[in-house]
């Protein structure tokens, strides 16, 4: 399987999530879908030019995508317990879910949380796919390591294996 085929497979898998049964979870999944799709397209474009370009996508384009979709009472993003980008901190309400996903790998279903003022939070896990290992794995190329060290001096987002929990997608919205 070529690199591009593996990449496409991994990114398609990346945006697919289990169907949640409750209305709030379905709404959360629907709200997150455009973010995941736009991020996927941006990563595909970056990876087509090499893994080093994907670093720029994650650093520059992903926050812009999240900001552009965070409107009309919707806030969304990505977070992790092992941050690469210090701006991707976990919202306080999502921290217990991230901790649960981290400590209970068998229970990583999407979850919703009732928040104050008729707001709902929704969280989905982000799992490491084979193509992610170029930038998040245990053995990084010298060019990737150099670029990561320059872009993210306090990077903690390496050392993963396929299937590991990378972090979460989260969204907060009005019910």
Task: Kindly label every feature range from the protein language model.
Residues 1-6:
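Positively charged n-region of N-terminal signal peptides that target proteins for export
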Residues 7-16:
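Bacterial N-terminal signal peptides
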Residues 21-129, 143-175:
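Extracytoplasmic c-type cytochrome modules immediately beyond a signal peptide or single-pass transmembrane anchor
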Residues 129-139:
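The canonical Cys-X-X-Cys-His
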């Amino acid at each position: 399987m070529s690199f591009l085929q593996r990449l496409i497979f991994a990114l398609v898998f990346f945006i697919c999530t289990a169907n949640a049964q409750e209305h709030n979870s379905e709404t959360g999944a629907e709200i997150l879908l455009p973010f995941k799709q736009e991020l996927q397209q941006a990563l595909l474009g970056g990876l087509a030019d090499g893994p080093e370009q994907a670093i720029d996508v994650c650093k520059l384009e992903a926050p812009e995508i999240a900001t552009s979709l965070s409107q009309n009472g919707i806030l969304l993003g990505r977070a992790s317990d092992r941050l690469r980008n210090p701006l991707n901190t976990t919202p306080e309400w999502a921290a217990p879910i991230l901790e649960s996903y981290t400590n209970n790998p068998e229970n990583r279903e999407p979850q919703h949380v009732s928040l104050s003022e008729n707001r709902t939070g929704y969280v989905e896990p982000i799992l490491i796919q084979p193509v992610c290992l170029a930038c998040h794995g245990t053995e990084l190329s010298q060019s990737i390591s150099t670029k990561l060290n320059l872009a993210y001096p306090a990077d903690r987002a390496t050392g993963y294996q396929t299937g590991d929990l990378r972090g979460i997608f989260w969204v907060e919205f009005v019910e």
